[in-house]
Amino acid sequence: MKYTSYFLALLLCVLLGFSGSYGQGQFFREIENLKEYFNASNPDVAKGGPLFSEILKNWKDESDKKIIQSQIVSFYFKLFENLKDNQIIQRSMDIIKQNMFQKFLNGSSEKLEDFKKLIQIPVDDLQTQRKAINELIKVMNDLSPKSNLRKRKRSQNLFRGRRASM
């Protein structure tokens, strides 16, 4: 993998921002360990521009930003999974993953397991593709705003109630 990917992956962790002075200090030390290990401070890392920070600038709305952040966090989990056998940087990756888990998934183990399941789904498997297409309508319905539907049902119920009482 290119060093640029590693450096920018670490940059996202910084962008997510972590609270707590002790935890934050340790977090930054672990990032520095990874930067040193991957030689991420080398000037050639900047070649081609950043991976994520420019994309994040384009998304202002908080709920929209969460969508992009989920894709970026997914990248980091895949990156860390790819490097899981590297004992030299394992501790640093574990601390960073824990911080991401707390910040992005609010410390929910169930959400983490679901998130891991999603990023492990192979997109080049025919059976997976068939299942995904089969579920597409339900997924699209879940993506649709529900507030308008609720308002419409509520106003219909109010209208029916008035008609019955007249």
From Swiss-Prot:
Which parts form a coiled-coil structure per UniProt? none
Q: Which protein family is named in the record?
A: Belongs to the type II (or gamma) interferon family.
Q: Which GO terms describe its molecular function?
A: cytokine activity; type II interferon receptor binding
Q: Which residues carry this modification: Pyrrolidone carboxylic acid?
A: 24
Q: Does the keyword Methyltransferase apply?
A: no
Task: State which residues carry a glycan (glycosylated).
Answer: 39, 106
Q: Which GO terms describe its cellular component?
A: extracellular space
One GO biological process term is: positive regulation of biosynthetic process
Asked if the record carries the keyword Protease, the reply is: no
The organs and tissues expressing this protein are described as: Released primarily from activated T lymphocytes.
**What protein name applies here?**
Interferon gamma
Quaternary state and partners of this protein? Homodimer. Interacts with IFNGR1 (via extracellular domain); this interaction promotes IFNGR1 dimerization.
Enumerate the InterPro entries for this protein.
4_helix_cytokine-like_core, Interferon_gamma
Q: Where is the signal peptide?
A: 1-23
Q: Which UniProt keywords apply?
A: Antiviral defense, Cytokine, Glycoprotein, Growth regulation, Pyrrolidone carboxylic acid, Secreted, Signal
